[in-house]
Amino acid sequence: MKPVLVLAILAVLFLRLADSVPRPLNVVVSEIKSAHFRVEENQCWFHMGMLYFKGRMSGNFTKKHFVNVGIVSQSYMDRLQVSGEQYHHDERGAYFEWNIGGYPVSHTVDMVDITLSTRWGDPKKYAACVPQVRMDYSSQTINWYLQRSMRDDNWGLLFRTLLVYLFSLVVLVLLTVGVSARLRFI
């Protein structure tokens, strides 16, 4: 009973420490000074080593415009371009929507760039999104979370990752030992 109490106290302390570290927020950085285009929604997050992002941009669009969503990393070799936008036109005007989920990325990804261009023009960065890290409870992505926390010096994420992983191992061992002990006496 005492080890369980000690583990519970340590879990509360680690989770409080993890919550005291500020997490990255969704950031919208407008770089085109124009009243013609507006970002209405811009969200991105990491979950299970995958990148999810969705958003909406409205303005004076024509079919010649297109929005490109790119993933920016610390290394230039990881500069990826992801295209999943959809052009819409209704009574409120023209807008672009993107909803890209489950894109596998390395732990070095820093930002999602949203660029706006025409078919003949150079793309201009219009907005950016800094992904939030959403913790999961699977051991498949433990390595990704450990690398990300060490790269960012995010001690809260490191402690949460280790705590969740160790807790899942303890539960697995207790279940395995309990099942094998029950089977032995049946």
Swiss-Prot record:
Residues 21-160 are lumenal. Glycans are attached at N60. This is Membrane glycoprotein US3. InterPro entries: Herpes_US2/US3, Ig_E-set. Keywords: Disulfide bond, Early protein, Glycoprotein, Host endoplasmic reticulum, Host membrane, Host-virus interaction, Immunoglobulin domain, Lectin, Mannose-binding, Membrane, Signal, Transmembrane, Transmembrane helix, Viral immunoevasion. The keyword Transport does not apply. It comes from Human cytomegalovirus (strain Merlin) (HHV-5). Monomer. GO terms for molecular function: D-mannose binding. It is a single-pass type I membrane protein. It is found in: Host endoplasmic reticulum membrane. Disulfide bonds join C44-C129. The signal sequence is not cleaved. N-glycosylated; mostly exists in a high-mannose form.
